[in-house]
Every structure is written in structure tokens, then in C-alpha cells.
Amino acid sequence: VASKKLWVDRFWLVVKYALIAFATAFLIRAFLLIPVPVEGNSMEGTLKQGDMVVIEKISPIQRFDVVVFQLPDGSTYIKRVIGLPGESVKYVNDQLYIDDEPVDEDFLVKNRSNDHESASYTNDFDLESLLGVEKLGKDSYFVIGDNRRASKDSRSFGPISGEAILGNARFVYYPLTHIRLI
């Protein structure tokens, strides 16, 4: 009888720890870290088609963060934040300007072949010509893909709201040969 009670106690202890582990994993996945697949080549140079990234929902959005967001039509994208609320954004001769000040984009790998060296990597634009406004709105972010020539981003669908942002992409965990922080 004593050994049976010991076995039952151990069984319930294992069940209790398993439930705690599952609940913890569920809470982490639901509220902190979420796996997301990379689809398309608009972030080529930073992320590749088929990479799996983990996003987190806690950190505030900063310039050059790679974020995952959802548009009103339900489509999900992963892009880099270039412009923050209240800022003016423009590109002239492949140079990013925020509030008329030049900003370097050290992360950007310019995938140019020799025969396109004279071509612009990021076509010139400003918010006035794209959206008819000088500055981004109170909760608006301007996002753009690192592979500028092959990216559908804020240049085509406009700025995104902070509410649309699902989280910051923090690291690539698959494929195993590509594991790294973003």
C-alpha cells in the first residue's frame, strides 16, 4: 500500500510539472515570443525565404527594427522601420533623410550587379509625393524592405499603425545554419 501511494504521489507530481511546463510554454508563445516564417525576398540581405524568426511583443518600436505586422486585408509582412511617428522621411540619391538630416543605413547590403552600379538602389521619394503629407501621423510607422527593388512596403501601401505591429523580429532560429540575432 505504501509503494502504491508513493507511485501515485510521483505520478501526480509529474503531471503537475508537465502542466506547469505546458502552461509556461503557452504563455511565452502567446505573449512574449512567437515563431514566424519569412515569405518572399523583400528582406533579402537580412532574411531569406524560408527563414524562421522569433518575434517579441514587449520592446518599444525603434528606427531600423525589423517588425512583423498585419495589414487590414489580413496579409502579414516583415519589414524594417525607417520612419517613426511625427517624422518626415525622404530618399534622395540613395540617402535616407529623417527630418532633413542624413541617416546612415549600415545594415543595408546593396545587392548590385556590376551592370547596375549607376542605378538607384532606393528610388527617390518623400512623404509629400507618396502620401500628400509632410510628416508621419501620431501612431504611424514607415516600413521598407531591405531588398528595395523587390519590396512591397509603405511606398505602396502607406504607413502602418503601431496597432498593426505584431512584434519585433529578434533572431533567426531556422535553418540551423542561419541561426543569428537580427
Regions found by a protein language model. Name each.
Residues 2-11, 16, 23, 27, ...:
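Soluble "head" domains of membrane/secretory-pathway proteins
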Residues 25-44:
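Aromatic-capped interface at the extracytoplasmic side
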